[in-house]
């Protein structure tokens, strides 16, 4: 991508207080975005740091607290862009999981599935619905980028409900790409292991360290991807550089899908 691919864009990023969401917000700001609407669910202090990084790049940063599982909150997030008359790119990054060994079928309940689907599948749907008119108002086709997971393809990941929810998100990406063309493009990025505090928080430091070491040792590219590594691909999908790309699920996993099985899933 060329510097300035997001020149004067109005961008919405959900789940942008830390990790991949923050990296996406900072990157679009560095690419010239005019406005970055930063959604977060709980941590206002972390979200403010994301806003600070965007403002340091010259973008206007707007913070909107809200849970994407709540349709009213989704409409409130979209309303923050209303004064600008459009949304050029929507990054549906908010997500959640429940860490559980796949073989431990008694370790997750039906409610766990519903809780994950509410955020990981219904949330992105509600965000697209809330933002549709503003995405269609963009001077070029508006772009939606979903944050899915390599677990959607391999069935691996932090838990069975998580992998299943991301598989559903990939299928929904295809459905929406057909339904919303030609005025809106819809794609998904499917990360593998990302070296962020999210894993350590859910699995513990020791397990996260093993995952990191295993990624470096066993993936074909011998790397543990950072949030910035994944953000580069997500930002590509939201940019004019991918203007002829829709309905794509882009695997950004250092080659994990070629056969490497993460320790957490064994």
Residue locations for each model-derived region?
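Residue(s) in the substrate-gating loop at a strand-loop-helix junction
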Residues: 149
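Short C-terminal tail/terminal secondary-structure segment
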Residues: 2, 102, 154, 235, ...
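Short, small/polar-rich loop/turn modules that mediate ligand/substrate recognition or access, typified
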Residues: 181-185, 190, 245-247
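Conserved glycine-rich cofactor-binding loop
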Residues: 17-18
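Catalytic Tyr-X3-Lys loop
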Residues: 106-125, 145, 169, 221
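Alpha-helical segment proximal to the catalytic Tyr-Lys
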Residues: 133, 177-182, 243
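Conserved glycine-rich Rossmann-like NAD(P)H-binding loop of the short-chain dehydrogenase/reductase
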Residues: 33-49
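Active-site helix of classical SDR
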Residues: 128, 165, 173
């Amino acid at each position: 991508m060329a510097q300035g691919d997001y020149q004067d864009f109005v961008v919405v990023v959900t789940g942008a207080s830390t990790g991949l969401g923050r990296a996406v917000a900072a990157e679009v700001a560095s690419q010239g975005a005019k406005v970055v609407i930063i959604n977060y669910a709980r941590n206002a202090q972390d979200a403010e740091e994301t806003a600070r990084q965007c403002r340091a790049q010259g973008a206007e940063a707007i913070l909107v607290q809200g849970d994407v599982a709540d349709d009213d909150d989704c409409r409130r997030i979209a309303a923050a862009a209303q004064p600008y008359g459009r949304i050029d790119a929507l990054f549906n990054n908010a997500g959640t999981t429940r860490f559980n060994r796949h073989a431990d079928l008694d370790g997750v309940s039906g409610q766990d599935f519903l809780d994950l689907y509410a955020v990981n599948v219904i949330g992105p749907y509600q965000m697209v619905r809330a933002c549709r008119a503003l995405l269609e108002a963009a001077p070029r086709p508006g772009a939606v980028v979903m944050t899915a997971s390599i677990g959607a393809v391999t069935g691996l990941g932090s838990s069975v409900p998580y992998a299943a929810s991301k598989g559903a998100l990939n299928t929904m990406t295809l459905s929406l790409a057909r339904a919303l063309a030609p005025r809106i493009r819809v794609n998904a990025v499917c990360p593998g292991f990302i070296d962020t505090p999210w894993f350590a928080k859910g699995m513990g430091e020791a397990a996260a360290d093993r995952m990191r070491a295993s990624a470096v040792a066993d993936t074909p590219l011998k790397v543990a991807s950072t949030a910035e590594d994944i953000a580069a691909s997500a930002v590509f999908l939201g940019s004019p550089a991918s203007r002829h790309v829709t309905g794509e699920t882009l695997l950004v996993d250092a080659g994990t899908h070629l056969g490497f099985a993460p320790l957490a899933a064994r």
